[in-house]
């Protein structure tokens, strides 16, 4: 007998969390159930062609309890899923939206725990601001843990969350020809998201890093040579790469199928977001990936003193960019929050992490993965092993129904 399930995402939920929620919703729909998905208007594009009913919730936030309880009654919902539990609590609790009604609902409430909160750090560290994770967000018994990011052995609720390759012929040769790449050229793909734009940051230190980090990357990676091209997939062209001339190409935001084709045409993914869904796509595509992170904090003088061999270029850049804060998700932070999640996690073996300020390691790691076939093959082998381990896990619908 089919059932109706309600999914609730906070309006500020990122594309990654909503995309993971949609993966579960589509699996339930494929097995005959119905899903009503409440989410912000900004993510409506994700629902196109999915067959999942999306209802914008932006105008209902301050009457959420009444709205949700009435909807559950009207639609006779069998369950409520929070997409994801962290964004629901961190977005709604600070603005005074009461969430204690969730504990009193007569139906199961399931927490999509995108970050595996019981393993993560206790604070949502945003550089200078580090609000604690609300205890109720950690308390849900019914949790769905997508892999990645959770460890495959994290316990009940884990499910395979790697994207699947669509049934399409290989596109590498055709796309590389379209991009004007020669046989000796190497293509680095750099995806960015709207939430990373400088003008959308709420804190000055985030906006400064959103502007300045691409400047440092462009200057440092120029050392890779004329054979290396960069393809930027994102909402807005970056002026930081102007010195690359025609070797920098801006693609804009693209549909998932096009992104998959571009990744298959690329030789390296360069990311500043450790947990980006584009990184998951790279694992599926067998695309070597470098993730840039920063574990250092301090003023320009403090950071230079800690690196006696700092180049003149790094010193000049720090004069504009510092003070820095640690990050695993640029420009926000979350270094302390995510570090425990990545410890002893096989997901962390599917990419090479490099420090923002270690210019030699950044250049040489990228150079090896672009030009040394054995280095690229070794990383692909780790991706292959991880893929097989994830594929052995329960699917999203199976994990979901395990909590009903």
List each language-model region with its residue ranges:
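Conserved catalytic-core segment of nucleotide-activated headgroup transferases in glycan assembly
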Residues: 20, 24-27, 164-243
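C-terminal alpha-helical cap of glycosyltransferases
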Residues: 360-368, 389-404
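Active-site and donor-binding regions of nucleotide-sugar-utilizing enzymes
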Residues: 6-30, 36-154
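A nucleotide-sugar donor-handling region in carbohydrate enzymes
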Residues: 122, 126-197
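Short, flexible/disordered intra-domain loops and linkers
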Residues: 87-95, 121-129, 196-211, 300-308
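Catalytic binding pocket for nucleotide-activated donors in carbohydrate/polymer assembly enzymes
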Residues: 277-381
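Donor nucleotide-activated moiety binding/catalytic core segment of transferases
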Residues: 65-67, 172, 233-285, 290, ...
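Short loop/turn segments at strand-loop or loop-helix junctions that form parts
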Residues: 8-10, 80-87, 112-115, 187-200, ...
């Amino acid at each position: 007998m089919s059932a109706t399930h309600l999914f609730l995402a906070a309006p500020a939920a990122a594309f990654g969390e909503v995309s993971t929620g949609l993966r579960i919703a589509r699996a339930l729909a494929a097995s005959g159930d119905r899903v009503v998905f409440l989410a912000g208007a900004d993510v409506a594009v994700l629902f196109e062609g999915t067959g999942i009913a999306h209802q914008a919730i932006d105008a209902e936030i301050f009457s959420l309890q009444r709205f949700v309880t009435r909807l559950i009654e009207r639609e006779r919902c069998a369950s409520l899923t929070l997409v994801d539990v962290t964004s629901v609590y961190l977005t709604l609790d600070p603005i005074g939206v009461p969430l204690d009604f969730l504990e009193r609902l007569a139906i199961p409430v399931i927490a999509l725990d995108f970050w595996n909160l019981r393993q993560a750090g206790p604070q949502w560290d945003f550089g200078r601001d580090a609000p604690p994770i609300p205890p109720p967000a950690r308390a849900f018994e019914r949790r769905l843990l997508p892999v990645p990011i959770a460890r495959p052995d994290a316990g009940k609720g884990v499910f395979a969350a790697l994207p699947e390759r669509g049934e399409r012929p290989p596109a590498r040769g055709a796309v590389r020809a379209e991009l004007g790449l020669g046989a000796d050229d190497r293509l680095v793909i750099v995806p960015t998201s709207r939430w990373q734009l400088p003008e959308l940051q709420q804190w000055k230190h985030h906006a400064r890093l959103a502007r300045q980090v691409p400047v440092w990357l462009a200057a440092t990676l120029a050392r890779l040579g004329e054979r290396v091209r960069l393809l930027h997939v994102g909402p807005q062209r970056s002026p930081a790469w102007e010195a690359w001339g025609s070797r920098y190409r801006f693609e804009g935001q693209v549909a998932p199928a096009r992104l998959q084709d571009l990744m298959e045409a690329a030789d390296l993914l360069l990311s500043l977001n450790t947990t980006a869904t584009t990184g998951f796509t790279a694992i599926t595509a067998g695309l070597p990936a470098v993730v840039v992170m920063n574990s250092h904090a301090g003023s320009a003088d403090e950071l230079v003193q800690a690196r006696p061999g700092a180049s003149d270029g790094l010193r000049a850049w720090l004069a504009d960019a510092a003070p820095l804060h640690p990050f695993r998700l640029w420009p926000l932070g979350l270094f302390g929050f995510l570090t425990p999640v990545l410890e002893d996690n096989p997901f962390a073996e599917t990419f090479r992490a490099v420090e923002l300020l270690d210019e030699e390691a950044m250049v040489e790691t990228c150079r090896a993965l672009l030009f040394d076939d054995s280095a690229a093959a070794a990383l692909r082998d780790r991706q292959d092993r991880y893929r097989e381990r994830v594929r052995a896990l329960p699917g999203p619908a199976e994990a979901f129904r395990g909590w009903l």
